[in-house]
Curated annotation (Swiss-Prot):
HAMAP family, alphabetized: ArgB
Reaction it catalyzes: N-acetyl-L-glutamate + ATP = N-acetyl-L-glutamyl 5-phosphate + ADP
Pathway: Amino-acid biosynthesis; L-arginine biosynthesis; N(2)-acetyl-L-ornithine from L-glutamate: step 2/4
Gene name linked to the record: argB
Organism whose genome encodes this protein: Methanosarcina mazei (strain ATCC BAA-159 / DSM 3647 / Goe1 / Go1 / JCM 11833 / OCM 88) (Methanosarcina frisia)
Transferase keyword on record: yes
Family of this protein: Belongs to the acetylglutamate kinase family. ArgB subfamily.
Keyword ATP-binding: yes
One Gene Ontology cellular component: cytoplasm
Lineage: Archaea, Methanobacteriati, Methanobacteriota, Stenosarchaea group, Methanomicrobia
Pfam families in the record: AA_kinase
Site description Transition state stabilizer, residues in chain: K27, K251
Name of the protein this chain belongs to: Acetylglutamate kinase
GO BP, one annotated term: L-arginine biosynthetic process
GO molecular function, one term: ATP binding
């Protein structure tokens, strides 16, 4: 039975009161931005959060767009354990897509819907300092093999001062997941990981990871198998069982880092479902997976 509109608003009130003046880091994944309408709906919801007194920070991905751009340029996208293998050319393509296209588009939409957006990368103000990940040693057909995933980084230090300044002035920061190392090299860092690290550095109340599935599914082919709550202690077992796999691994690990570092809750939700973020935040039932 559908709730009356006034009941929905009353149900939302205690959550709005609880979250007032709190910071929420929202990762908008490329897979959640499969159409212009979905993107607009997500940004409208984020601007609404700002208007009800919440301080949102956006970290965006762009995986499908990067892959599409690579294919148009005749280059095959390759992945290892959910991370994009990033050689010099792929790094340049990623910067072109993330900074020149997606970031500016999100900032523009925020302005269109009455908010104040400002774009950043991790190397602006040395916000995200990192290092290149070491080569991976894995068994392939019983033979130990070294896999170099290129300019894929891990963050070492998050400098959130500029974000605090922007939030206090009413801006919505929009961050591309590109870091810088000690030598000034750009690093491609998984956006879920960046979002978790930034949420921890900002002491955010919530980390919200938006993707194209309705949270963590016990059976990826069955939307009804959603796991609504995951404890930190259960994550390793779920990875061993294969329930958490592929691109969901960095999402869950990013969420776990954030929660272990003091973020109260992390949520994985389906951004392609209309207003799913508002339903997750402001209703009793929720629509995604909560990590705590």
């Amino acid at each position: 039975m559908e709730l009356k509109r006034e009941n929905v608003l009353i149900e939302a009130l205690p959550y709005m009161q609880e979250f007032y003046d709190s910071i929420m880091v929202i990762k908008v994944g490329g897979n959640a931005m499969v159409s212009a309408q979905i993107m607009e709906d997500i940004i409208k919801d984020i601007v609404l959060l700002r208007y009800v007194g919440i301080k949102p920070v956006i970290v965006h991905g762009g995986g499908p767009e990067i892959t599409e751009k690579m294919e148009r340029m005749g280059k095959k996208a390759e992945f290892f354990q959910g991370l994009r293998i990033t050689d010099d050319e792929t790094m340049e393509i990623a910067r072109m897509v993330l900074v020149g296209n997606i970031n500016t588009k999100i900032v523009s939409l925020i302005g269109l819907f009455g908010g104040k957006g400002v774009g950043f990368t991790g190397y602006d103000g040395r916000m995200i300092l990192g290092h290149k990940q070491a080569a991976k040693h894995v068994l392939i057909d019983g033979v130990e093999t070294e896999v170099d995933i290129g300019w894929v980084g891990e963050s070492e230090v998050i400098n959130p001062e500029i974000l605090h300044i922007m939030l206090e002035k009413g801006y919505i920061p929009v961050i591309s997941p590109i870091a810088v190392d000690a030598k000034g090299n750009a690093l491609n860092i998984n956006a879920d990981t960046v979002a978790g690290d930034i949420a921890a550095a900002l002491h955010a109340k919530k980390l919200i990871l938006m993707t194209d599935v309705s949270g963590l599914l016990r059976n990826i082919k069955d939307p009804g198998s959603r796991i609504s709550r995951v404890k930190l202690d259960d994550i390793d077992l779920l990875i061993e069982e294969g329930v958490i796999s592929g691109g969901m691994i960095p999402k869950i690990k990013g969420a776990a880092v954030a929660v272990k570092s003091g973020v109260e809750r992390a949520h994985i939700i389906n951004g392609s479902v209309s207003h799913s973020m508002l339903l997750e935040l402001f209703t009793d039932g929720g629509v995604g997976t909560m990590i705590y």
